[in-house]
C-alpha cells in the first residue's frame, strides 16, 4: 500500500517467502574469533515474512520520518535426515525474529535520528542445543547539523552508538563495544 500527498508519504509492504537452497555456503568462526571457516550446507529450507511500514511528513521547515521493519523466519538445515544433531536445526547465526525502528526529526539544517534494533536468539553451534546467543537490543542516536555557504556544505555530526550501553555478542565470547561516541566534521565543495 502506498499513499502520497503534498506533505505526507505513507507505505506498508509485507512479503512472504520460501527458499530451498542447495550448497549454501556459510562463514562461521569455528576455529576462534579471528579465523573463520567456510561451511557448506548441502540443502537448507527457509520460509519467512518481511514487513515494512514507513511514514514521512514534510513542511517548509520540518521533516518527520518513521520506518519500522519486522522479519520472522525459519531457516533450517535439511541436508541429512539421518543426522539428528543437525537435521531441521536452525542455521547458525540466523535469528528467527529481528526488527528495527528508525525515526528522524528535522528542522531546517538540524536533524536528530534514532534507530532501534532487536535481534532474537540464534544458535552458534550444532554441538550443543544450549549454544544459543541471547537476544539483544541496540539504540543509536545521531544529531547532524549542515550549513551551506554558497556552494560549500559544512557539517557536524555527533553520534552515540549503543545508547543504553547494553552488552551483547554477535559471535560467542566476542562482546561488542559498549556505549561509544563519534564526532564527524564534513566539508564539501
What do the PLM-derived regions correspond to, one by one?
Residues 6-21, 37-122:
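Gram-negative outer-membrane beta-barrel transporters
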Residues 1-4, 52-56, 102-106, 144-146, ...:
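Transmembrane beta-barrel domains of outer membrane proteins
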Residues 28-37, 77, 81-90, 129-134, ...:
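Flexible, surface-exposed loop regions and adjacent strand-edge segments
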Residues 23, 27, 31, 120-121:
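Transmembrane helix-loop junctions in multipass membrane proteins, especially transporters and channels
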